[in-house]
Amino acid sequence: MGVERYLLVALGGALGSLLRYGLGAWVQGSLGAGFPWSTLFVNALGSFLIGLTLRLSLEGALSGEARLFLAVGVLGGFTTFSSLSYETLALLQGGEVGKALLYAFGSLFLGLLLAFLGYRLGGALVG
């Protein structure tokens, strides 16, 4: 694997992290504290976009380099499982068991659903 591929992933990851920070700050500022809305939003959007991106890649509508940049780089930097884990733990430690369970399982369900919908949309766009 050439150094160019690593650079694509690194640049995409930097872009994805910047997008997560900016969009996350806007979402949390808009919806308020008390629930990790920003992480839920970026992970849900990222799940949809990874489904779409990977389907387009599988159908040949994206090159291998575009897939690396978008799926591994941008969306890898955009989504965050570690924040989901930490925020769930913080809710549990704060005694908010119901919120923690809703957040953890809701995030998983929403992520899977949106990845599926993105995948289906990708198929419809090229099929």
UniProtKB/Swiss-Prot annotation:
The keyword Metal-binding applies. It catalyses: fluoride(in) = fluoride(out). It is found in: Cell inner membrane. Fluoride-specific ion channel. Important for reducing fluoride concentration in the cell, thus reducing its toxicity. Na(+) is not transported, but it plays an essential structural role and its presence is essential for fluoride channel function. The lineage of its organism: Bacteria, Thermotogati, Deinococcota, Deinococci, Thermales. Belongs to the fluoride channel Fluc/FEX (TC 1.A.43) family. Its main location: membrane. One of its GO terms (cellular component) is plasma membrane. This is Fluoride-specific ion channel FluC. The keyword Transmembrane helix applies. The chain crosses the membrane at residues 7-27, 31-51, 68-88, 97-117. It is a multi-pass membrane protein. Keywords: Cell inner membrane, Cell membrane, Ion channel, Ion transport, Membrane, Metal-binding, Sodium, Transmembrane, Transmembrane helix, Transport. Pfam families: CRCB (PF02537). GO terms for molecular function: fluoride channel activity; metal ion binding. Na(+) binds at G76, T79. One of its GO terms (biological process) is cellular detoxification of fluoride.
